[in-house]
Amino acid sequence: MLASNTKLFTTSAALARYGAAARLATEVRGTGTLDTEGTYSGSLYLVGGGDPSFGSGGFARRAYGGGGSVETLASRLKAIGVRSVTGRIYGDESKFDSLRGGPDSRYRISPYVGPVSGLAYNRGLASENGRGYQANPPAFAAARLDAALSRAGVAVRGAPRAARTPAGAAPLVKTESPTMAKLIRLTNKSSDNFFAEMLVKDLALQASGKGTTRGGAKLAAAFAKRLGGGPGSLADGSGLSRGNRASPYRVARLLQGMRGRDEFPAFFDSLSIAGRDGTLRPRLRGGAARGRCRGKTGTLSGVSAVSGYCTALSGDVYVFSILMNGVNPSGARGLQDRMLQAIAGVR
């Protein structure tokens, strides 16, 4: 079992498909007309594009250092002359399927992830202090855009709701995520399950126009196979499912294959640095491995994993993958650390 080493498959495929500089857009479309007085006669549709970082400006700055926000959309709508809206704000999450989770939670909301949505707002949290989850993410996001418009001095007559955007709705404004390179860094450094489950659906969205966990997992597996690292099975994007399986050899082949790709610098930068940041910060704080090894950790009940790269004292770069099943994760980590110290210490 891979545990969160599954994220190596998800993020490498996302980088390859989108490119390191790509950004995910959340846009506002409209079905009306704007007159010279600033009245928009019609309704506005907030269309999610699968951005895991979208939300309020304050939340995005605190959590990610910035990202797409409802405040940006409100200011841009005002900038194009909108002063009032006769209709209402609709939230549209239809670029993803309606399933809120992965197979580990029977496709319902997982307490380890939160509600997955094509129009995710503040990670699906019901409040900015992190308490509770949204029952209806697209309606929640629409209400937050409505509130942001009100603060900007734009009056909206109708109450916000969730609905699919009608054909022919015109694009008005958009806001964008950080780059894909940053999104996968946020995913891998801290082992972010929410970002990983959003990104696996983004894979399917980019390929087929509809974001699904199953479709994205198939694409991630196919990409790894092209690099010689095809897994036994991938069931989700984060590694919460015990159906994510591969041998250490296959993980190592994926990692080695990434070294020859243009996206490798971004992929390498996304991994935790031993003793310094991410999930490896509390580990390997001394010895040859500190600062010389980068990796992705993984933990489930009875499962512990770490895979990545070590630059040894000799200057040679070693690819490693250690997947341990049927173990006590705490004790397993100690053994893994000794192995990485040995690799990094090669002269």
Features from the language model and the residues they span:
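Active-site-adjacent loops and short helices of periplasmic peptidoglycan-processing enzymes
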Residues: 1-136, 152-185, 189-195, 205
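Residue-level marker for well-ordered alpha-helical positions
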Residues: 9-12, 71, 143, 218, ...
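Surface-exposed charge patches
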Residues: 13, 75, 147, 222, ...
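Short amphipathic alpha-helical signal-transduction/dimerization elements
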Residues: 15-19, 146, 150, 259, ...
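Small-residue-rich helix-loop
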Residues: 200, 204-347
